């Protein structure tokens, strides 16, 4: 933080120049209220402390001089004579203020943002004068103004507008960005002469001891304006956010129009302005109008309908007191509902209850039966023949399975089995239990050599019976010869 903001000097009357005194090196003391330029001492220079700020104490008149805030915040008044009011020249000061205001308005207007008021300026402090030791009277230095120092701290001290002169810089030496901050607590409206300036990238600001609180971009003290501080006129200043800052005007966000919300709002207003005259039951689910009066409506499908609006969706027949069918929140009379249903592939009647689908067709559960035993096949395995006739497994095997050449019965799978096992010999089919020797009844096997089949003259014989018959035939042939 740089040194304090010094008030610009003015030319006082020589006869009323205050008497000064020598100050020790490093001591804090204010400049004279009316800017008597002090001659620099060759050995002793005045070095102001960085914590000093110059402002006018609350409740004091303007002619009491300037108030200084020391390191501990206690106001300290400078020793000197009251300011001379004869050298202020109010006419020239007002003209100069108006000229500076118009110049700032033109400059800011060309940059595309709102013009800044004189109270928003951060004045560059002139070089602090040096005190001369001794008890002699202090005389103003007739030389030129000292060169401006480096840019000061962004925490500019409040400066009364009546002290602005032609030698005051028109603007700060560094670029100023006036930001519109959020509403500040504990701070009143901006005063004329108070500077609110922020550097290009200011760091975080914290309250300092003996000073006001730092809020947002500038410095502002918690004090009421004194007699010498002029309040801004209404309409010139406003709360934070009311005027555009260096970042352009703030435009409130506008929500896009919602037609549904607007329609519901208008409907609500219309209903409030036009209440129903009779007994109100609700809004009709068909036409959308109010259902008013006893006996004027019916309740169905969790909605209220006019009697004339509750009709079949297909034939438009009134359904009051009738049985109706609800499909996807639509009402149908019985005949129209039945016409929309699937028909059974066996009896060709509409299926009103459960639908059993098989082979891409719809059936009543009672119509899906075996064509042989007429047993219902709902949940039971079935099969079809070449003509698409439905059979249960047992009847299908009985009807189409091969027959045994011994017993004549159908050769079917064993209980719990799915495959059929049979023995084929001499182009005939046999059950496993029916494959026996025709002479002795020995159970034959297709695997064993001793119990294998030895057919003779179309007969199924075992090995022993086959050999005995061969010998018998041989003996007969020999005898005949």
From Swiss-Prot:
State the superkingdom: Eukaryota
* Chain residue ranges for the region called Disordered: 1-259
Q: Which UniProt keywords apply?
A: Cell adhesion, Cell junction, Cytoplasm, Cytoskeleton, LIM domain, Metal-binding, Methylation, Nucleus, Phosphoprotein, Repeat, Transcription, Transcription regulation, Zinc
Asymmetric dimethylarginine PTM positions: 25
Residues with PTM Phosphoserine: 92, 195, 254
Annotated Basic and acidic residues bias: 108-122, 221-233
Which molecular-function annotations from GO does this UniProt entry contain? interleukin-1 receptor binding; kinase binding; metal ion binding
Q: A GO BP term, please?
A: chordate embryonic development
Q: What does this protein do?
A: Relays signals from the cell surface to the nucleus to weaken adherens junction and promote actin cytoskeleton reorganization and cell invasiveness. Involved in lysophosphatidic acid-induced cell adhesion and migration. Acts as a transcriptional coactivator for NF-kappa-B and JUN, and mediates the transrepression of these transcription factors induced by glucocorticoid receptor.
Its quaternary organisation is:
Specifically interacts with the ligand binding domain of the thyroid receptor (TR) in the presence of thyroid hormone. Interacts (via the third LIM domain and C-terminus) with PTPN13 (via the second PDZ domain). Interacts (via the second LIM domain or via the third LIM domain plus C-terminus) with PDLIM4 (via PDZ domain). Found in a complex with PTPN13 and PDLIM4. Interacts with SVIL isoform 2. Interacts with LPAR2 but not other LPA receptors. Interacts with PRKAA2. Interacts with MAGI1. Interacts with SCRIB.
Q: What is this protein called?
A: Thyroid receptor-interacting protein 6
| Organism the protein comes from | Bos taurus (Bovine)
Question: From which lineage does this chain's organism come?
Answer: Eukaryota, Metazoa, Chordata, Craniata, Vertebrata
Q: Gene that codes for this?
A: TRIP6
């Amino acid at each position: 933080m740089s040194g304090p903001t010094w008030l610009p000097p003015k030319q006082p009357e020589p006869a009323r120049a205050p008497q000064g005194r020598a100050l020790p090196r490093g001591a804090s003391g204010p400049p004279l209220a009316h800017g008597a330029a002090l001659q620099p001492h060759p050995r002793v220079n005045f070095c102001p402390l960085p914590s000093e700020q110059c402002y006018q104490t609350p409740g004091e008149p303007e002619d009491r001089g300037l108030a200084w805030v020391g390191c501990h915040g206690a106001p300290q008044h400078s020793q000197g004579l009251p300011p001379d009011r004869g050298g202020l020249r109010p006419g020239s000061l007002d003209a100069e203020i108006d000229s500076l205001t118009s110049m700032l308005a033109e400059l800011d207007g060309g940059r595309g943002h709102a013009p800044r008021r004189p109270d928003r300026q951060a004045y560059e402090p002139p070089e602090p004068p040096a005190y001369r030791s001794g008890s002699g009277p202090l005389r103003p230095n007739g030389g030129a103004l000292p060169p401006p120092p480096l840019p000061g701290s962004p925490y500019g001290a409040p400066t009364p507008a009546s002290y602005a002169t032609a030698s005051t810089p028109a603007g700060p030496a560094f670029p100023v960005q006036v930001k519109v901050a959020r509403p500040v607590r504990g701070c009143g409206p901006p005063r004329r002469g108070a500077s609110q300036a922020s550097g290009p990238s200011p760091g975080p600001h914290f309250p300092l001891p003996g000073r006001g609180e730092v809020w947002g971009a500038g410095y502002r003290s918690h004090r009421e304006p004194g007699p010498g501080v002029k309040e801004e006129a209404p309409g010139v200043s406003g709360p934070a956010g009311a005027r555009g800052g260096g970042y352009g005007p703030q435009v409130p966000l506008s929500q896009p129009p919602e037609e549904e919300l607007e329609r519901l709002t208008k409907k609500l207003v219309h209903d409030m302005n036009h209440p129903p005259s009779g007994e109100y039951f609700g809004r009709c689910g068909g036409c959308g109008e109010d259902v008013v009066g006893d006996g004027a409506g019916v309740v169905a499908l969790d909605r209220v309908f006019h009697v004339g609006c509750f009709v079949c969706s297909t034939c438009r027949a009134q359904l009051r007191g009738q049985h109706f069918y609800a499909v996807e929140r639509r009402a149908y009379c019985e005949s129209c509902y039945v016409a929309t249903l699937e028909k059974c592939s066996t009896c060709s009647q509409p299926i009103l209850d459960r639908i059993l689908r098989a082979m891409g067709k719809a059936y009543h559960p009672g119509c899906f039966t075996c064509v042989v035993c007429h047993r219902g096949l709902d949940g039971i395995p079935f099969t079809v023949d070449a003509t698409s006739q439905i059979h249960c497994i047992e009847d299908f095997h009985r009807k189409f399975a091969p027959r045994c050449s011994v017993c004549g019965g159908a050769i079917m799978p064993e209980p719990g089995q799915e495959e059929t096992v049979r023995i084929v010999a001499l182009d005939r089919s046999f059950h496993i239990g029916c494959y026996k020797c025709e002479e002795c009844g020995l159970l034959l096997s297709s695997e064993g050599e001793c119990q294998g089949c030895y057919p003779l003259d179309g007969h199924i014989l075992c090995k022993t019976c086959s050999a005995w018959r061969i010998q018998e035939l041989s003996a007969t042939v020999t005898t005949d010869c």
